[in-house]
Regions:
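Short, small-residue-biased leader/transition segments that mark boundaries at the very start
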Residues: 2-7, 229-234
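A general structural detector for well-ordered alpha-helical segments in enzyme core domains, enriched
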Residues: 22-24, 162, 182, 223
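Structured core of small recognition/catalytic domains
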Residues: 11-26, 96-147, 153
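Extended, well-ordered alpha-helical scaffold segments
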Residues: 112-131, 170-189, 212-231
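An acidic-aromatic substrate-binding cleft motif
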Residues: 31-126
Length: 237
């Protein structure tokens, strides 16, 4: 007998408008088990709330000029911003993701106070250009103050994505050009032999094509394809 004759699939649809954890007790064929379900709000609602929290609580407006406009880690227990030279607590690196999220949320019209969020993003964009990136060369630094004492290629995909999202939001060509220069710098620094997480080559090529930037499109495509050629194993006859 096949498994289909022994086990009959049963489906149960669980719906609840209230968020939170729910525990279901399941009994089938005298077998008992427990299932825990976490009901969350819709992704767009969560994204909007996250963006509002970033704008209201995670942007620096204090006395330190170097950090003006930065999105920083936030201590929910102490209710304070946190910034230290340590990699996971500085003003660079994965904090870029907060800027990416707000730019995408603005593109999708998810935010109630659009004007406030866009002003916040403008301030973060200015911080990014001033403290983390050399827009002329494409260099991406690990920490504010153009501090690149800790070299990290993983910062480049984040930066390319951020400037691409700003380009898509505002249509300002310099953001697209900056994304190209960062990509070129990534490969210049041995990015050919480095496997990055989420290097947005396809999105960059699509946006360059839309913008009619054929020369930059060819440059980016050639750089990416050269990575494939380098990665090919050597064949012996």
């Amino acid at each position: 007998r096949g498994l289909g004759d022994v086990y009959k699939r049963q489906e149960y649809l669980f719906e609840n408008e209230k968020t939170g954890e729910y525990v279901l007790s399941i009994c089938a064929d005298e077998v008992k088990t427990t299932c825990r379900l976490l009901v969350q709000e819709r992704p767009e609602t969560l994204a909007a709330k996250r963006c509002a929290f970033i704008v209201d609580h995670q942007q620096y407006h204090g006395k330190i000029k170097e950090l003006q406009g930065a999105y920083l880690p936030y201590d929910n227990e102490e209710k304070i911003l946190v910034c230290t030279p340590e990699n996971d607590f500085n003003a660079g690196r994965e904090r870029t993701g907060m800027g990416v999220l707000i730019a995408r949320a603005l593109q999708q019209n998810l935010l109630k106070d659009r004007e406030k969020a866009e002003q916040s993003l403008r301030e973060y964009h200015a911080f990014y250009l001033r403290e983390l990136v050399n827009a002329a060369t494409g260099l991406v630094c690990n920490c504010s103050g153009k501090d690149n004492s800790y070299f990290r290629l993983y910062n480049y995909p984040w930066a390319v994505t951020f400037f691409l999202e700003c380009w898509k939001l505002w249509g300002e060509k310099e953001n697209l050009k900056t994304a190209v220069r960062i990509t070129e710098k990534f490969y210049e620094q041995d990015g050919f032999r480095f496997y990055p997480i989420e290097m947005p080559i396809v999105m960059l090529c699509q946006e360059l094509k839309k913008a009619g930037e054929q020369e930059d499109l060819k440059t980016v495509r050639d750089l990416f394809l050269s990575l494939i050629h380098i990665s090919e194993p050597t064949r012996h006859s």
